[in-house]
Amino acid sequence: MLVKILDACCGSKMFYFDKTNPNVTFMDIRRYSDILCDGRKLEIKPDIIGDFRNMQFSNDEFDLVVFDPPHLIKAGKNSWLAKKYGLLDFASWQDDLSRGFNECMRVLKPCGTLIFK
């Protein structure tokens, strides 16, 4: 049985052992690559560029949705935390998370599973 999974804020796909799993649609608002100060490569390479607050998927499309949105509202412009995890807008973060949660529930099938991390 094919299980359709959406990672709505995949970032560098740290959540996954198999970063090429064909069952997972990796989505993020950005595509980004950088070398961190300790020499590690940071690569954000989603399948789909998209905004978790306004997803372009049909209702009830996924069996499992992973929602691990950015959780920082303050960070320096060159902060590795901001580069790795992204930033929420200081003025709208509560509304952004609420809209994202609602979108995740919309694209999740009835009786599906939401992982809110």
Residue ranges with predicted function:
Residues 1-117:
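Class I S-adenosyl-L-methionine-dependent methyltransferase catalytic core
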